[in-house]
């Protein structure tokens, strides 16, 4: 019997920098790093799923939970159906805004395209 399985990313100071897109099969988050001045840049993180994601959402922690978890504010989650005995696959990745991917929009576009490629792989016929 199928059961839910969850993949998630820890959020610190999410402030709108989170995408939970079940329909397109990816979740993303922009982490501000530890330097509040921005000198260290931002880290983009995400997960893409080749199979259908049933639900994707942000879950924020209560103030007490935040203290107990050392600064985490919550999670962005992708919930899928898992059939025991089968494989569960997802792809996790990251980028840095001081390298090739400079903006949150560029990161989200990259992840959306990557998830689309996972879901519709190249088919070669001869």
Cite the ranges covered by each PLM segment.
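A short, structured loop/turn motif at beta-sheet edges
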Residues: 2-3, 37-38, 51-54, 81-87
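Solvent-exposed beta-strand/loop surfaces of large extracellular or lumenal domains
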Residues: 16-33, 57-65
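Short, flexible loop/turn elements at secondary-structure junctions
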Residues: 9-13, 33, 94-96
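A recognition module on extended beta-rich or small alphabeta surfaces enriched in W/G with H and D/E
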Residues: 25-56
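Generic structural hydrophobic/aromatic packing signal, biased to beta-strands
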Residues: 7-9, 29, 45, 90-92
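Acidic (Asp/Glu-rich), glycine- and aromatic
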Residues: 2-23
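Beta-strand-rich recognition/accessory modules
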Residues: 55-126
């Amino acid at each position: 019997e199928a059961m839910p399985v969850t993949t998630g990313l820890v959020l610190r100071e999410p402030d709108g920098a989170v995408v939970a897109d079940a329909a397109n099969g990816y979740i993303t988050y922009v982490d501000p790093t530890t330097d509040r001045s921005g000198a260290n840049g931002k880290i983009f993180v995400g997960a893409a799923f080749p199979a259908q994601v049933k639900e994707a959402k942000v879950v924020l922690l209560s103030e007490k939970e935040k203290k107990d978890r050392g600064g985490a504010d919550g999670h962005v989650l992708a919930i899928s159906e898992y059939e025991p005995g089968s494989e569960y696959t997802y792809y996790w990745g990251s980028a840095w805004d001081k390298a090739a991917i400079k903006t949150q929009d560029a990161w989200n576009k990259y992840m959306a395209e990557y998830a689309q490629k996972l879901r519709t792989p190249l088919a070669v016929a001869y």
